[in-house]
Swiss-Prot record:
GO terms for cellular component: large ribosomal subunit. InterPro entries: NA-bd_OB-fold, Rib_uL2_dom2, Ribosomal_uL2, Ribosomal_uL2_bac/org-type, Ribosomal_uL2_C, Ribosomal_uL2_CS, Ribosomal_uL2_dom3, Ribosomal_uL2_RNA-bd_dom. Keywords: Ribonucleoprotein, Ribosomal protein, RNA-binding, rRNA-binding. One of the primary rRNA binding proteins. Required for association of the 30S and 50S subunits to form the 70S ribosome, for tRNA binding and peptide bond formation. It has been suggested to have peptidyltransferase activity; this is somewhat controversial. Makes several contacts with the 16S rRNA in the 70S ribosome. HAMAP family: Ribosomal_uL2_B. Residues 223-276 are annotated as: Disordered. Belongs to the universal ribosomal protein uL2 family. PROSITE patterns: RIBOSOMAL_L2. Residues 265-276 have a biased composition (Basic and acidic residues). One of its GO terms (biological process) is cytoplasmic translation. One of its GO terms (molecular function) is structural constituent of ribosome. It comes from the Bacteria. It comes from Caldicellulosiruptor bescii (strain ATCC BAA-1888 / DSM 6725 / KCTC 15123 / Z-1320). This is Large ribosomal subunit protein uL2. The gene is rplB.
Amino acid sequence: MGIIVYKPTSPGRRNASVLNYKEIITKTEPEKSLVFTEKKWAGRNNQGRITVRHRGGGHKKKIRIVDFKRDKDGIPAKVEAIEYDPNRTAFLALLCYADGERRYIIAPEGLKVGDTVMSGPDADIKVGNALPLKNIPVGTMIHNIELMPGKGGQLCRSAGSVAQLMAKEGKYALIKLPSGELRYVSQECRATIGQVGNLDHENVRIGKAGRKRWMGIRPTVRGSAMNPVDHPHGGGEGKAPIGHPGPLTPWGKPTLGYKTRKKNKPSDKFIVKRRK
């Protein structure tokens, strides 16, 4: 998939590029039965307090119902369309099953309109097919990996993501994640064959602040530019040092390199090698 690089006709266009969607998108309107609308929360919780900063505004979006479980076993499905989804970096493939049901899945690299995919233990080792890890050969590239059997895929779902099945030992399979982490997952967990599509996503240059605003992302103000009442880094004359042994969050907690993972987490025993 190609990238369109704009000519510098204005300051905002000078460093901007976009994906050439015409090369891959085959349908512009989503399947009506598989979308719903949701109120914008702008980073607020049910009490109206900001729990995630720098969120708000942005273009209206419809939520697509995506099948991460791939639990419709033994029934072949034909790819009807490849669609854009504003809620994720990957594209979606619209499947039409032999019994007439339609579902969205994350579109893997190489999946085209007219291809047939299937899920279940008896499915072939083919791009887009979903199987339990116990039925996938060692060395296979996989995505949309479950952490608990039947819960639905949670790992490797964004554009270009791919993991590798490294080994099988007893009830568990060893997988290598894009972060470099090696971890065990139950062999009953399902994964989809192949790599998530839209590999060029990482090469797109946003180019201007306005494009981030369209995405619903607001500006991030540096703590050193604030007053002392607003941030531990604030205050001082001119560009003053932060005045602490290390950088702090707006709430006074250590940050930038500070480990935030819970100690003695139950899943620690499944992680062979931590992420880089």
